[in-house]
């Protein structure tokens, strides 16, 4: 079968791998027919980062946990890339009861069992059954397990009754192309807080977490936030934020300052710039008791946080990987019920066969598609 592999910066290729097979009665084989590019994938695609990050790890300039996720030479190719997909079930082990051949499903980016202590606590990305290290995941290379990337002809899914989440009937799969990661990640940054503070105000700092920030802004509007301010320097993303109902604010490219913001305080702030300055500004923008959710990558081990300001303002900062599997049922139900137009964030829909070229494009949200089996 074919799998899209990252060979090096700006270079991706289809490469052959053995077809996956059912290895146990709880396995499933699925065929992805829609895949989207995670915001984080653009880092190794568009930049020469492997050797600089290796040096940074050696010199203590990058937190050592990065090696546990991406390897001692982070993002060194070739490896299968991609960890967001909508797939069709094509084969099932004998003990799988929750899915049927032909079902359309979301596959979470992190591989989890559903039964261990971590999974029962909702920390499915930290599953102790599937991971011997930091993560067990699709699309991050061998350090995160043998699963390969999701831009592939077929995938083996262990613990299928737990892992596979059916897409509601009538819901366009293109609308939930990023539900495996970025769309769910955005959900957890705003919706739980707005459920606690109905009508609350939301600030989104857009940037490196390109689609996450936009999904978060749109979900906040759909959840009934009283104010949703989206701050960014890039025209394409500002226009998308406005289409989703947020108020867009252009700021200069470069280090973000508190004076760049609209001049009010917020119940919820989503930090998507992946910078220490963004963390500082987001925290200082909060109302008393406000929540800042950081959705970026913060590689240096000494990223500064204004702890005393947080103390005085009773602020909460949440940083952590996304635990998608527990989120998916509520997210999919919300999108179907509220007709949330997540596809507005998609800036390029490309043919599946064109993946090596399409994945190199500099665009906010890339989605690949091909026909379902038997589709006309």
Task: Give the residues covered by each predicted segment.
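Helix-to-beta-strand junctions that scaffold the AdoMet/dcAdoMet cofactor pocket
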Residues: 286-287
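NAD(P)H dinucleotide-binding glycine-rich loop of Rossmann-like/cofactor-binding domains
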Residues: 63-83, 113-205
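A short acidic, Gly/Pro-enriched loop at the edge of an enzyme's catalytic core
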Residues: 259-269
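Mid-domain Rossmann-like dinucleotide-binding core that forms the NAD(H)/NADP(H) cofactor-binding site
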Residues: 104, 166-254
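Rossmann-fold NAD(P)-binding glycine/threonine-rich loop
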Residues: 296-314, 330-331
């Amino acid at each position: 079968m074919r799998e899209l592999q990252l060979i090096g910066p700006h270079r991706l290729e289809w490469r052959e791998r053995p077809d996956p097979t059912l290895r146990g009665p709880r396995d499933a084989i699925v065929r992805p027919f829609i895949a989207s590019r995670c915001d984080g994938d653009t880092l190794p695609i568009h930049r020469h980062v492997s050797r600089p990050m290796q040096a940074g790890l050696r010199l203590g300039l990058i937190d050592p946990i990065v090696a546990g996720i991406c390897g001692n030479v982070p993002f060194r190719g070739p490896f299968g890339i991609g960890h967001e997909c909508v797939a069709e079930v094509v084969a099932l082990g004998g003990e799988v009861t929750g899915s049927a051949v032909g079902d359309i499903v979301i596959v979470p980016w992190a591989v989890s069992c559903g039964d261990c202590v971590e999974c029962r606590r909702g920390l499915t990305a930290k599953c102790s059954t599937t991971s011997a290290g930091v993560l067990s995941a699709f699309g991050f290379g061998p350090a995160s397990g043998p699963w390969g990337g999701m831009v592939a002809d077929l995938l083996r899914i262990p613990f299928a009754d737990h892992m596979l989440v059916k897409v509601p009937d009538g819901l366009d799969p293109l609308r939930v192309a990023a539900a495996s990661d970025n769309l769910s990640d955005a959900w957890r940054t705003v919706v739980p807080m707005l459920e606690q503070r109905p009508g609350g105000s939301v600030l989104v700092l857009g940037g490196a977490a390109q689609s996450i920030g936009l999904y978060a802004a749109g979900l906040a509007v759909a959840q009934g936030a009283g104010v949703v301010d989206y701050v960014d320097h890039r025209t394409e993303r500002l226009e998308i934020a406005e289409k989703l109902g947020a108020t867009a604010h252009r700021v200069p490219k470069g280090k973000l300052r508190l004076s760049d913001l609209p001049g009010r305080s917020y119940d919820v702030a989503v930090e998507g710039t992946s910078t220490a300055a963004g963390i500082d500004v987001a925290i200082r923008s909060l109302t008393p008791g406000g929540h800042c959710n950081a959705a970026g990558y913060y590689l240096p081990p000494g990223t500064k946080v204004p702890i005393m300001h947080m103390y005085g303002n009773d602020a909460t900062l949440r940083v952590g990987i996304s635990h998608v599997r527990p989120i998916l049922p509520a997210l999919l139900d919300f999108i179907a019920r509220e007709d949330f137009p997540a596809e507005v964030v998609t800036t390029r829909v490309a043919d599946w066969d064109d993946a090596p070229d399409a994945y190199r494009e500099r665009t906010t949200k890339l989605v690949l598609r091909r026909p379902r089996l038997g589709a006309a």
